[in-house]
Amino acid sequence: MSKKPKVASNTIALNKRARHEYFIEEEIEAGLELQGWEVKSLRAGKANIGDSYVTFRNGEAFLFGGTITPLNVASTHIVCDPTRTRKLLLNKRELDTLYGKVSRDGFTVVALSLYWKNAWAKVKIGLAKGKKLHDKREDIKDREWQVAKQRIMKNANR
């Protein structure tokens, strides 16, 4: 008999604050250029993308602010930098559209989630526009109203 495949979440890290701070206009999947110790740390779930964003240099995109904590058993002859900038692997067309919108339209690009797709580590990046304080309050009111509405409907059906 063959073994059943493990049912596990493919998500490594989430940036929940990004959806609170920004309006996400578009989401794009990008690959990451990683070193060996980083892949081992990601498999252990030691990643944080809470303050990460994307910048453009020489026609390439780089992820800044993402932290991958090295494992204790990492190699001694390799210097592990947890906060190094990591190159994003995107198509030329995707790079051009993102760069154009960021430079002209006042958008920013933030990391939304880090996950496994087959054996590859991928990052979902979002083209985002910053929210004002009143927008955040409006979102909170809408969320609270949805919860209250569900509660009312649940009690009405009894």
UniProtKB/Swiss-Prot annotation:
Location(s) in or outside the cell: Cytoplasm
Keyword check for RNA-binding: yes
Disulphide bond pairs: none
UniProt keywords, alphabetically: Cytoplasm, RNA-binding
Function summary: Required for rescue of stalled ribosomes mediated by trans-translation. Binds to transfer-messenger RNA (tmRNA), required for stable association of tmRNA with ribosomes. tmRNA and SmpB together mimic tRNA shape, replacing the anticodon stem-loop with SmpB. tmRNA is encoded by the ssrA gene; the 2 termini fold to resemble tRNA(Ala) and it encodes a 'tag peptide', a short internal open reading frame. During trans-translation Ala-aminoacylated tmRNA acts like a tRNA, entering the A-site of stalled ribosomes, displacing the stalled mRNA.
Protein name: SsrA-binding protein
Species, as recorded: Glaesserella parasuis serovar 5 (strain SH0165) (Haemophilus parasuis)
Molecular functions per Gene Ontology: RNA binding
GO biological process: trans-translation
Family, as annotated: Belongs to the SmpB family.
NCBIfam families: PRK05422.1 (NF003843), smpB (TIGR00086)
Superkingdom per UniProt: Bacteria
GO cellular component, one term: cytosol
Pfam families assigned to the protein according to its UniProt record, in alphabetical order: SmpB
